[in-house]
Amino acid sequence: MSAQDFLVELGTEELPPKALATLGDAFLAGIEKGLQAAGLNYTGKQVYAAPRRLAVLIRQLDVQQPDRSINIDGPPLQAAFKDGEPTQAALGFAKKCGVELSEIDQSGAKLRFSQHIPGKATASLLPTIVEDSLNDLPIPKRMRWAASREEFVRPTQWLVMLLGDQVVDCTILSQQAGRESRGHRFHHPQNVVITTPANYVEDLRKAYVLADFAERRELIAKRTTELAMQQEGTAIVPPALLDEVTALVEWPVPLVCSFEERFLEVPQEALITTMQDNQKYFCLLDSEGKLLPRFITVANVESRDPKQIVSGNEKVVRPRLTDAEFFFKQDKKQPLETFNERLKNVVFQAQLGTVYDKAERVSRLAAYIAPLIGGDAQRAGRAGLLSKCDLATEMVGEFPEMQGVAGYYYALNDGEPQDVALALNEQYMPRGAGAELPQTLTGAAVAIADKLDTLVGIFGIGMLPTGSKDPYALRRAALGVLRILIEKQLDLDLTPAVEFAVKQFGAKVKAAGLAEQVLEFIFDRLRARYEDEGIDVATYLSVRALKPGSALDFDQRVQAVQAFRKLPEAEALAAVNKRVSNLLSKAEGAIAEQVEPKYFDNANEFSLYSAIQQADQAVQPMAAARQYSESLARLAALRDPVDAFFEAVMVNAEDAKVRANRYALLSRLRGLFLGVADISLLG
């Protein structure tokens, strides 16, 4: 079957830059879906996305649908005819197939409808495939334009559709398909004739358009790096910003610009924020990570006088930097702590009080937590009290991303200790999955306190997260607490900490069962964390059954169980623990704590008892030191005496005292393993 390249390009007004790559990928996916549904094969694919166009190239696409044969079996002949006359079953089958009964094959044991369906020309199928793909694009809100009733993310301007060197005749979104595209608005305002699908990229390149998103992205990244090196700096190139800039230009030309050095007195985070978010510039840092008074802009034109573009960008950014400078100076005119007065009029949550109320709670809880993790209570309390002050500053009012960062600078300006100042920023850490954690113990205490306060408060008024709705980011808060404690190796029992947080709210929350509910929610987050690490759910559940209060202790047990499961004895011991657990659950009355050797009547009982005593003596110091892996490895040696016991001993002996003593022995055995985890859940 012959094949040809297929190209479709939809020209539009400027597409939303943050959605461009997604729209391009979805356009390709939709076309592939349509081609596959039509049974059309191809050898390659490529998507192109630029500010004014979405395009897809399909390489070596079948020009003809393959013929198809369908065979549908109907009712048996015996049921299809009675006394030589067709039954309702036969007539119904013919009607279902859309033919007369005489056209149905009656030569076999059943009625059979056979039909040969010739394949259609690909060119006749492509308009519907393209149109369906465009209709399925993830566009939150479509728009209409002029007098047209068509809807799309932006008004359409032109349409190119070529199969081989022939135009696919159709009209989509009010555009008649042709072979004429458009070049760069300024460098090549004339139409561009696309000779063949394979020449699409080069035809546009001659018209100063780089259609390939990935090519533009790579060019911008490479040239930005080169220019930064020439300035003896390193460019800050966040992937999201790089994607957005790539989506804004068809012919990228990076240029170096500068600003006055006096602006460097402003916190560099504020300058970087305004240059990145508002102007889409790439900022430059020196070898020590300090901001240079230069930045890189990406022009969409190759100017004969690039100095004019540089000058224009420098003029545009100056007022924004001046604003940041003004806010910084204004805020520093008063001590940071005084901003707490404003927070007394800012509601955190209607039922839970003001932001100032929250700061006071965080202060007390942080002071409680700090000494438990090796920190200083007084400094943690001070940091907690100042933690929300910068929310009332001019700087954060203009640049919300500066919350915490602004507080750090203002605290230093007021002469606060370094760790107190750092804690004002670290309270928000981690800001996302895999993000940086607090480096100071003061910061860790405030971060944990802030998150626990939010969890307890919101749970306490019944506003639990449901499905995808989590307006107070409670899942992220819980994961943040766990990450800080586990990855910073901080051994904090969360149970009393959460109970302390509950007491602070008083009558504002429903306290009954609240601490348990919050703790359950926090530790439930570990399940997904361990699954992401490749740790089996059963391992998590074996530790969860013991309900450790320390996240660090929980993690150490999980890692130990994971290592234990790799031992050759693990599977058998897990099965034995499950058997023992079932036996003990059926025991009548309380199980004795002491084992009485005088009731043993089998050598294997003595052997197991001796092995348990030796193991107990060995693992006690290990358990005290939380050497859980070593403890389980030592307990693995119990496999042989345990196996021998169950082979030779009837646990449910007729003699009640012997039976009770054997239950006590097995309880001792199970207790050894429960010192680490309930491994009966591993089976």
Curated annotation (Swiss-Prot):
<dbReference type="InterPro" id="IPR008909">
    <property type="entry name" value="DALR_anticod-bd"/>
</dbReference>
<dbReference type="Pfam" id="PF02092">
    <property type="entry name" value="tRNA_synt_2f"/>
</dbReference>
<keyword id="KW-0648">Protein biosynthesis</keyword>
<keyword id="KW-0030">Aminoacyl-tRNA synthetase</keyword>
<keyword id="KW-0963">Cytoplasm</keyword>
<comment type="similarity">
    <text>Belongs to the class-II aminoacyl-tRNA synthetase family.</text>
</comment>
<dbReference type="GO" id="GO:0005524">
    <property type="term" value="F:ATP binding"/>
</dbReference>
<keyword id="KW-0436">Ligase</keyword>
<dbReference type="InterPro" id="IPR015944">
    <property type="entry name" value="Gly-tRNA-synth_bsu"/>
</dbReference>
<dbReference type="GO" id="GO:0004820">
    <property type="term" value="F:glycine-tRNA ligase activity"/>
</dbReference>
<dbReference type="GO" id="GO:0005829">
    <property type="term" value="C:cytosol"/>
</dbReference>
<dbReference type="GO" id="GO:0006426">
    <property type="term" value="P:glycyl-tRNA aminoacylation"/>
</dbReference>
<dbReference type="GO" id="GO:0006420">
    <property type="term" value="P:arginyl-tRNA aminoacylation"/>
</dbReference>
<dbReference type="GO" id="GO:0004814">
    <property type="term" value="F:arginine-tRNA ligase activity"/>
</dbReference>
<protein>
    <recommendedName>
        <fullName>Glycine--tRNA ligase beta subunit</fullName>
        <ecNumber>6.1.1.14</ecNumber>
    </recommendedName>
</protein>
<keyword id="KW-0547">Nucleotide-binding</keyword>
<dbReference type="Pfam" id="PF05746">
    <property type="entry name" value="DALR_1"/>
</dbReference>
<keyword id="KW-0067">ATP-binding</keyword>
<comment type="subunit">
    <text>Tetramer of two alpha and two beta subunits.</text>
</comment>
<dbReference type="InterPro" id="IPR006194">
    <property type="entry name" value="Gly-tRNA-synth_heterodimer"/>
</dbReference>
